[in-house]
């Protein structure tokens, strides 16, 4: 029954998260907010809403291992699993990637995150530091986007969930379903994951780093698989880099304002360094244009399997 509840929690998070994004995007556009701002803020935060609610729920329930494990584990899974699986399906030519600056931000933010973790917990001031760093990244991205002179109509066509014809009652319904479903799904998932940890005699940290992290990374995996099939390497890399940025700064930043998140010793001695290492592993693909094909897919998945084995 616990596994069924875990699946229910994941499904609720994904579906409710999609409802929230669609509702928030279309409401913002109705209010006259430019598509560029909606894309860089509301969509970015909205697609990370499942991870955010899981982190907040875990922190308030005193299971910080799940909160931290979800974020750190998701960042590891995003590189090794979310890039590894699509690479088996279709070779991605990463030459001329537009993700170089975002990659540098991601690595820099990872170093900042590790430094803050050595304070022993993520509380109010650590959360504010992370959110300030995220604001700088968003500001830089917005400046770059404006320099590209892309019209608002073009942005609207590419904007996830945008539907100018959507009636107001549907917009409000999507918002309501998202706001109800997200905390409900997070509550079910955290409770079920904690129960699984107790049943198997493992720590909530291990469950957060594996089961919860993989589950909350499934939407990114689906998006990246589609990008690989369409030969959109930039979309695949940008999806992973953007998700990792928001996981570190947005999710832990906001969650730590709600409740302190303690950092278990194993994060400081192992998992955070694995996260940084696999992030740096993306450098040849981003800067040198290495082709991400089947051989590299096998290597990435083997590394991920090895990492999971070391946790068990």
In which residue ranges do the predicted regions lie?
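Hydrophobic alpha-helical segments, chiefly the membrane-spanning helices
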Residues: 1-312
